[in-house]
Amino acid sequence: MHPNYYLSPLAVAIALGIASPVKAADPIPLQKSSFSEVTQKFQLTLPGVMKGAVVSTNSLQFIRQHTDGNKVTHVRMQQQYAGFPVFGGYAILHSKNATPSLATAKSDEKMNGVIYDGLQAELGQPKPSFVKNASMALQQFKDKYANKQVSEDQVTPMIYIDEKHQAHWAYKVSVLVIHDDRIPERPTAIIDAETNKPFVQWDDVKTEKVQAKGMGFGGNRKIGEYQFGKDLPLLEITRDSSVEMCFMENTDVKVVDMGHKYYSNNKPMQFTCKETPDTQSTKTYYTGYSADGYDRDNGAASPTNDALYAGYVIKHMYHDWYGVEALTKSDGSPMQLVMRVHYGQGYENAYWDGKQMTFGDGDTMMYPLVSLGVGGHEVSHGFTEQHSGLEYFGQSGGMNESFSDMAAQAAEYYSVGKNSWQIGPEIMKEDSGYDALRYMDKPSRDGMSIDVADDYYGGLDVHYSSGVYNHLFYILANQPNWNLRMAFDVMVKANMDYWTPYSTFDEGGCGMLSAAKDLGYNLDDIKKSLSEVTINYQSCYVD
């Protein structure tokens, strides 16, 4: 396939010259220049002037115009030298004439922008090989992505003006690269025609890909249906205008549709979102494969919508309350939360595997497990792993599991200002025989969990030993002058700074006291709460 590039008639006519750089280009700030001065040095192609009529080496080519409410017409132009576009050379004419032209433009017309003089002396004319080598420059650029799916390759011969105002013959090259696991990118570079080294390079898909808003529905038959954009905030999604596709992804969260399979390339769920008069101004689009706001499954309105919202809330909760990322990469930079939904067949669970969160769609006992609480729970396993590293067995395992339950309640509290003190009530089906997975106010209500440390025994499942710290959290948050946020403050601080991988219940209590002291919270209230769940703090040293 031949590359796409544009040459003006003038460029073709003089492309057989010889280049002879001499000196730097001279920038002309147009706010300080008169219209007559500009027209003496540059040929303007205002509306009504045919492109083929351009005979000057230096020209300002018409791009577009519009007239504002003050009846001033603003005409945008790009500088060309020898028929090739000049990097950074743009002029805007501001005319009170409704149809500005060279004949009607006045000498005192206002302009702004920057154009460059002296290019003739610095560049001379392009070498015969300048245009011919454009295809070669593009191919070398494409070779960097030889193992990727590449399309829409483009090359434009041009003049590049560097930061020192030196002018260079150059090529602007770009390709569209399709990835299996993330949004497409458009690598773009301006390359030196002599050395093939880039002057600048960037991902140009950012000019087409915009943060957009998603409308849609969530919930399930038990809790009812709610609407994002009405009952809850609009969803933060991403849109690629070049292909009119939306992606269930933003800088914080990516939602992957597993399609009821067990393996995935982690490509974000995507759907067609065409521009309409209604969406053009609001940048708001209905989510779902049919763009109706749904991707129904097992009684739930849209697991993808709920997953995106849950991830967004959880990440922002940690950031807003504690100034930290929910999860980070090995170099300490923020980690995008990957929420995988529609996992497997009849899978009634959710998990964190060290890299991502995965949610089943439930079966006979549960609706899809993508509630805010379950999402907060799974993400917070990652938070614990990256901070205290509480091992997932014994008493430390119970603390690990409990911290995630606490985070589930905190996410609800952060989102709507209240919480249920139950884990998973929103996903349990009405005929399952259970109204929740666990209860923080009285953990033993589930028939398996323990309420106090004295009831712990070796080998107890961590989901049941979590009852001790779940109960502790409930008691502390309900002390006079306390609330859920304050209680979670203590637990987060302890997890980050005091707990260790093999902490026992008692050692965890000491960490809580140290954390509370750091925060300036009442230690006696903590001691009282610890006593109620038979955690011994007598050996704790808090200076």
UniProtKB/Swiss-Prot annotation:
Top-level taxonomy: Bacteria, Pseudomonadati, Pseudomonadota, Gammaproteobacteria, Legionellales
The name on file for this protein is Zinc metalloproteinase
Excised during maturation, the propeptide residues are 25-207
The similarity comment for this entry is: Belongs to the peptidase M4 family.
Q: What start and end residues bound the annotated signal peptide?
A: 1-24
Q: Which InterPro entries match?
A: FTP_domain, Peptidase_M4, Peptidase_M4/M1_CTD_sf, Peptidase_M4_C_domain, Peptidase_M4_domain, Zinc_Metalloprotease_M4
Annotated cofactor note: Binds 1 zinc ion.
Location of the protein in the cell: Secreted
Q: Which GO terms describe its biological process?
A: proteolysis
A single Gene Ontology MF term assigned here is: metal ion binding
Organism encoding this protein: Legionella pneumophila
Which Gene3D superfamilies does the entry mention? 3.10.170.10, 3.10.450.40, 3.10.450.490, Neutral Protease Domain 2
UniProt entry keywords in alphabetical sequence: Hydrolase, Metal-binding, Metalloprotease, Protease, Secreted, Signal, Zinc, Zymogen
Functional note: Cleaves collagen, gelatin, casein, alpha-1-antitrypsin, and bovine insulin. May play a role in the pathogenesis of legionnaires disease.
Record's GO cellular component, any one?
Answer: extracellular region
Q: What is its EC number?
A: 3.4.24.-
Active-site residues are: 378, 463 (proton donor)
